[in-house]
């Protein structure tokens, strides 16, 4: 099964080798017929501490790294 890849914004880089990425998804509410925004935060592994708050990044699912970390940062999307 392929690994999931998500895009989000780094909201915290205070932990060593870890960033918190906020991923937002939009969907149409079945009853209200409105577009609803929903967000979720993922802890992702950042080996070199190179990503800072506000960076747009891609994260990929991986094997568990710690109790909460199951994602790895792939690339900085803003850089291209």
UniProtKB/Swiss-Prot annotation:
Methyltransferase among keywords: no
Biological processes annotated in GO: translation
Pfam families according to UniProt: Ribosomal_S17
This protein's UniProt keywords: Ribonucleoprotein, Ribosomal protein, RNA-binding, rRNA-binding
Top-rank taxon, per record: Bacteria
Molecular function (Gene Ontology), one example: rRNA binding
Record's subunit section: Part of the 30S ribosomal subunit.
The protein's role, per its UniProt record: One of the primary rRNA binding proteins, it binds specifically to the 5'-end of 16S ribosomal RNA.
Similarity section: Belongs to the universal ribosomal protein uS17 family.
Protein name according to UniProt: Small ribosomal subunit protein uS17
Organism encoding this protein: Brucella anthropi (strain ATCC 49188 / DSM 6882 / CCUG 24695 / JCM 21032 / LMG 3331 / NBRC 15819 / NCTC 12168 / Alc 37) (Ochrobactrum anthropi)
